[in-house]
Swiss-Prot record:
Its EC number is 2.7.10.2. InterPro entries: ABL_SH2, F-actin-binding, Kinase-like_dom_sf, Non-receptor_tyrosine_kinases, Prot_kinase_dom, Protein_kinase_ATP_BS, Ser-Thr/Tyr_kinase_cat_dom, SH2. GO terms for cellular component: actin cytoskeleton; cytosol; plasma membrane. The modification Phosphotyrosine is found at residues 116, 161, 174, 185, 218, 231, 261, 272, 299, 303, 439, 459, 568, 683, 718. Residues 694-930, 1020-1182 are annotated as: F-actin-binding. It comes from Homo sapiens (Human). SUPFAM superfamilies: Protein kinase-like (PK-like) (SSF56112), SH2 domain (SSF55550), SH3-domain (SSF50044). This is Tyrosine-protein kinase ABL2. Transmembrane segments: none annotated. SMART domains: FABD (SM00808), SH2 (SM00252), SH3 (SM00326), TyrKc (SM00219). Residues 107-167 form the SH3 domain. Interacts with PSMA7. Interacts with CTTN. Found in a complex with ABL1, ABL2, CRK and UNC119; leading to the inhibition of CRK phosphorylation by ABL kinases. It comes from the Eukaryota.
Length: 1182
């Protein structure tokens, strides 16, 4: 009869069965074994707990049940007979059989009672009926099956189908370990007075009463005194829990109503294993009858089948040939063998002796959760049901967490739905047993990008915290009834947006506390995310002083009049939340679970992030549709608060969450998305954004829009660099594309791309003109921004953003610009330095001349990383590289904004470092409208050769040109604020600064070039405006605009000094002797790159001069820039570009380092450089 651990005779030391399941079968079935010995007349107010007196005299004379007197436990579990009035009989059968709550207990420890019906299926199993008494004889090896003897015979039954006759589980009202959300789900469809007693899942041993009344479920803690008595109200204490339930079934005594009807146990517990002797996993293929196909996956297909031996419906997963190794397939089965949880799909067996291979699991009739949510009746699947589903998944993942398993593919499509909304996590194809903190996937592994954590995308490393990230996305799927995450956002954009702090917006009707949990799961740093134990606890404590139905109703602007509220109804007004009180006077408020939180406003603190606004169109929004804060006048001032509610006391998660701000995402060299592939689309502004409220995003990403005035043009955004800045910096230095501006919008200038602007700023696509047909999109800059290739009438509107949100409101003007032809014959897409190329010069095109040229010298760092920098041989003294000019309309009287060097953050933070693969052509002799200049509104009809100088209120001088030099292109009389843009086409002839990474001679040492200076004292402390302009061939040319620059890593020159152009600062520029040849594409290969990396690694281990190391490093960068496009997988490309960025920064540090050459271990700069080279090699070898 199977293997036994021990034989149980008359000895009192009975081995206890395994833990019971938390749910049982539905209503008790009538049994006609015996009639009630004493017929009774039942009155109208019938209560099943009031008819117990006659059971006290019933004494059990024997086990076999052949005595006429009968035993009290057996009588307790049979329904009323025909001598009871029909109404009373129907109620008794509906809610449960009559129970003896006050009778004597049994003294036989081996006497058990059946909790559920069980039908024998062979292998010496025994059929039992609910309420039947049994004597346990022993258990099988794993304790999952018990050998019992009843009056019908002897055999095996599941251990979790029986319980000791004196245990609490024999009572119909006791449900064992049940979560709070599961209790609300079980009671949600019942009537007033329905109740259950449960043990808290999060606090074992803590019992509670869950009672439904008037559409609300109330939870009462059952307290225990020192002498072992239990009570709900301190005045009424009892020796046993049964006495307590009997008391409150007759009088409310502090409860909202009396306990009338025990909630039925809806689901039988899971039976692990199909029989007591089936302990081998290999199955006979002929035992399975295959039926229809359910679906297919990456490695195989899933069918419905029947296990003929047990007449059991199963799910059969087959393996496609040549798609997975047999060992990998068996690993999935091995993982499933180790896990046993009510909310994890159970493995039944495998067929691996010959192909095709099978994995046989339990069958879930309602399919995957994703399709179920999309097709369900939302009036039936209410917010209570959704919360119940999420709690089950959280419980399953907490179990995996304790077992050190990671799932790696947690999503709604991989969860299955059964009867009574039971959800089980399935698809363990990627699951792994964790032996350390993280697991690194093998090369070529595929993962769903929108569900995968950022660290997993970048480094292929997985942990339980990466599953927590996926669980947050799964919550979002549940809250939206199966919507696809990141709607309208391409896969290539997801990491890019996440890195900048973007997170999905709060779904319509989603309670703020649930959204807080999502945002906590989406913390950038894995250490800052909660564990699954904490998320499970969060669901237990989420709605102490309210119900989720009421929260959803308030979110949707509806009165919480019923519990059946559809939690996803768009565009309803949001009503202010208020603290809810009980609908009936409750005398025992201190014992209601969560009563200590009754004074807290659970919904008063609004969830952070973007709040819902007008519905987005059916296009592809890459920014949230919710662009306005729920409290328009509120401005979040602390970035630490952006992931939680303003009031931490009211936040459900604050009791155990780490109060840490997520670290700033690492800045990469370039965007992970490819350049725009639709150059023909044009955009123009159509929206009005005068009422956009101040926003602050999570993870340290903050920005504040300019305030609109009646006479100001609505603000517009353009693609610049992304940099992180403190909000409202009073220093307000000059602003460049890399975030040198003192706060304000400067932190997000790189956040808007044409695809993003199209949806969020009301852009509409226009038709290209005939002259634009040949135009090509310009490669994206190193700051992850990009510009569209053209606009109607060859015009593009650009926006210059305010430098400081506390300074005077600056007028934002639109600047006319045309698309530029990208440099020809460029093999590397990210080379940010200009390249001398005679044949690459584009034909001159008629364009308006520059109107205002800022004058002044510029302090430039060594080896400037940008490509928009060029100095001609004919540059006059005092003319350097142009920075950024802040010159709003009326600047003389309003004070203007300070000028500073473009691209150098004042606070020392480095912007995104350029990748050595983007082409940045140099300037033509004709004016390019990508570089806006200032127009003097007062100078008209001035000869072209007359140079006039304008000075603002701070003493900054600007070169003014007459208006007739500008062709009519709109907005002639408005001054422009100069902002660095994407680089223009190359000129026919120019002497350029050559990037060392493209030098053919690595030993060549460039000479130094010092930019001339022409400075003017400012009125605020003698700081100088570091600005320069480059006239070309004596003509009135336009300023050369440098892109964002990385500050010097030296102690003598601070970024703040460079940004403000401190007097006397002169920084030498490296200039090569001659233009170098690029490495041809056919010479770039994986082997060549690894060989170059090994050469640099070898050089680092020997005492060689720094200059030699720098030259070797630049040669490696040259190979990397050409090899990046050869990497097929986006995830590996992410990590590769980030490693190249680190290498380039390390080379910059080494170049300016004054430390003597050494070996790694003694020089930290060399250590960093060696780690970067090793990281590049690792990524390439994946």
């Amino acid at each position: 009869m199977g293997q036994q651990v021990g034989r149980v005779g008359e000895a009192p030391g009975l081995q206890q069965p395994q833990p019971r399941g938390i749910r049982g079968s539905s209503a008790a079935r009538p049994s006609g074994r015996r009639r009630d010995p004493a017929g009774r007349t039942t009155e109208t107010g019938f209560n099943i707990f009031t008819q117990h007196d006659h059971f006290a005299s019933c004494v059990e004379d024997g086990f076999e049940g052949d005595k006429t007197g009968g035993s009290s436990p057996e009588a307790l579990h049979r329904p009323y007979g025909c001598d009871v009035e029909p109404q009373a009989l129907n109620e008794a059968i509906r809610w449960s059989s009559k129970e003896n709550l006050l009778g004597a207990t049994e003294s036989d420890p081996n006497l058990f009672v059946a909790l559920y019906d069980f039908v024998a299926s062979g292998d010496n199993t025994l059929s039992i009926t609910k309420g039947e008494k049994l004597r346990v004889l022993g258990y099988n090896q794993n304790g999952e099956w018990s050998e019992v003897r009843s009056k019908n015979g002897q055999g095996w039954v599941p251990s979790n189908y029986i319980t000791p006759v004196n245990s609490l589980e024999k009572h119909s009202w006791y449900h064992g370990p049940v979560s709070r959300s599961a209790a609300e789900y079980l009671l949600s469809s019942l009537i007033n007075g329905s109740f259950l007693v449960r043990e808290s899942e999060s606090s074992p041993g803590q019992l509670s009463i869950s009672l439904r009344y008037e559409g609300r479920v109330y939870h009462y803690r059952i307290n225990t005194t020192a002498d072992g008595k239990v009570y709900v109200t301190a005045e009424s204490r009892f020796s046993t829990l049964a006495e307590l339930v009997h008391h409150h079934s007759t009088v409310a005594d502090g409860l909202v109503t009396t306990l009338h009807y025990p909630a039925p146990k809806c689901n039988k517990p899971t039976v692990y294993g199909v029989s007591p002797i089936h302990d081998k996993w290999e199955m006979e293929r002929t035992d399975i009858t295959m039926k229809h196909k359910l679906g297919g996956g990456q490695y195989g297909e899933v069918y419905v089948g029947v296990w003929k031996k047990y007449s059991l419906t199963v799910a059969v997963k087959t393996l496609k040939e040549d798609t997975m190794e047999v060992e990998e397939f068996l690993k999935e089965a091995a993982v499933m063998k180790e896990i046993k949880h009510p909310n994890l799909v159970q493995l039944l067996g495998v067929c691996t002796l010959e192909p095709p291979f099978y994995i046989v699991t339990e069958y879930m009739p309602y399919g995957n959760l994703l399709d179920y949510l999309r097709e369900c009746n939302r009036e039936e699947v209410t917010a209570v049901v959704l919360l119940y589903m999420a709690t089950q998944i959280s419980s399953a993942m907490e179990y995996l967490e304790k077992k050190n398993f990671i799932h790696r593919d947690l999503a709604a499509r991989n969860c299955l739905v059964g009867e009574n909304h039971v959800v089980k996590v399935a698809d363990f194809g990627l699951s792994r047993l964790m032996t350390g903190d993280t697991y690194t996937a093998h090369a070529g592994a595929k993962f769903p990008i929108k569900w995968t954590a950022p660290e997993s995308l970048a480094y292929n490393t997985f942990s339980i915290k990466s599953d927590v990230w996926a669980f947050g996305v799964l919550l979002w799927e549940i809250a939206t009834y199966g919507m696809s995450p990141y709607p309208g956002i391409d896969l290539s954009q997801v990491y890019d947006l996440l890195e900048k702090g973007y997170r999905m917006e709060q779904p319509e009707g989603c309670p703020p506390k649930v959204y807080e949990l999502m945002r906590a799961c989406w913390k950038w740093s894995p250490a800052d995310r909660p564990s699954f134990a904490e998320t499970h606890q969060a669901f237990e404590t989420m709605f102490h002083d309210s119900s989720i139905s009421e929260e959803v109703a308030e979110e949707l602007g509806r009165a919480a009049s019923s519990s059946s509220v559809v939690p996803y109804l768009p565009r309803l007004p949001i009503l202010p939340s208020k603290t809810r009180t009980l609908k009936k006077q409750v005398e025992n408020k201190e014992n209601i679970e969560g009563a200590q939180d009754a004074t807290e406003n659970s919904a008063s603190s609004l969830a952070p992030g973007f709040i819902r606004g007008a519905q987005a169109s059916s296009g592809s929004p890459a920014l949230p549709r919710k662009q306005r804060d729920k409290s328009p006048s509120s401005l979040l001032e602390d970035a630490k608060e952006t992931c939680f509610t303003r009031d931490r006391k009211g936040g459900f998660f604050s009791s155990f969450m780490k109060k840490r701000n997520a670290p700033t995402p690492p800045k990469r060299s370039s965007s992970f998305r490819e350049m725009e592939n639709q150059p023909h689309k044009k955009y123009e502004l159509t929206g009005n954004f005068s009422s956009v409220a101040s926003l602050q995003h999570a993870d340290g990403f903050s920005f504040t829009p300019a305030q609109q005035e009646a006479n100001l043009v609505p603000p517009k955004c353009y693609g610049g660099s992304f940099a992180q800045r403190n909000l409202c910096n009073d220093d307000g230095g000059g602003g460049g594309g890399s975030g040198t501006a003192g706060g304000g919008w400067s932190g997000i200038t790189g956040f808007f791309t044409p695809r993003l602007i199209k949806k969020t700023l009301g852009l509409r696509a226009g038709k290209p003109t005939a002259s634009d047909d040949t135009s090509k999109p310009f490669p994206r800059s190193n700051s992850t921004s990009s510009m569209s290739s053209g606009l109607p009438e060859q015009d593009r509107m650009a926006m210059t953003l305010p430098r400081n949100c506390q300074r005077s409101k600056l007028q934002l003007e639109r600047t006319v610009s045309t698309s530029s032809q990208p440099e020809e014959n460029v093999d590397r897409a990210n080379d940010m330095l200009p390249k001398k190329s005679e044949e690459s010069a584009a034909p001159s095109r008629e364009r308006p001349k520059a109107k205002l040229l800022p004058r002044g010298a510029t302090a430039l760092p060594l080896r400037t990383p940008s490509g928009d920098l060029a100095i001609t041989e004919k540059d006059p003294p005092g003319v350097g590289v142009a920075g950024v000019a802040a010159a709003p309309k009326g600047k003389e009287k309003n004070g203007g904004a300070r000028l500073g060097m473009a691209g150098v953050p004042e606070d020392g933070e480095q912007p995104g470092w350029p990748s050595p693969a983007k082409a940045a052509p140099v300037l033509p002799t004709t004016h390019n409208h990508k570089v806006p200049v200032l127009i003097s509104p007062t100078l008209k009809h001035t000869p072209a050769d007359v140079q006039l100088i304008g000075t603002d209120s701070q003493g900054n001088k600007f070169k003014l040109l007459s208006e007739h030099q500008v062709t009519s292109s709109g907005d002639k009389d408005r001054p422009r604020r100069v902002k660095p843009k994407c680089a223009p086409p190359p000129p026919p002839v120019m002497r350029l600064l050559q990037h060392p990474s493209i030098c053919s001679d690595p030993t060549e040492e460039p000479t130094a070039l010092t930019a001339g200076q022409s400075t003017s004292e400012t009125q605020e402390g003698g700081k100088k405006a570091a600005l320069g302009a480059v006239p070309i061939s004596g003509k009135a040319g336009r300023p050369v605009m440098p892109p964002p620059q990385v500050p010097l890593p030296t102690s003598s020159i601070s970024p703040a000094k460079m940004a403000n152009g401190t007097a006397g600062t002169k920084v030498a520029l490296r200039k090569t002797k001659q233009a170098a040849e690029k490495i041809s594409a056919d010479k770039i290969s994986k082997e060549a790159l690894l060989e170059c990396a090994d050469l640099l690694s070898s050089a680092l281990t020997e005492p060689v001069p720094n200059s030699q190391l720098v030259d070797t490093g630049h040669q490696l960068l040259d190979y990397c820039s050409g090899y990046v496009d050869c990497i097929p997988q986006t995830r590996n490309k992410f990590a590769f570009r980030e490693a190249v960025s680190k290498l380039e920064l390390s080379l910059q540090e080494l170049q300016v380092s004054s430390a003597a050459a050494g070996v790694p271990g003694t020089n930290p700069v060399l250590n960093n450089l060696l780690s970067c080279v090793q990281e590049i090699s690792d990524v390439v070898q994946r």
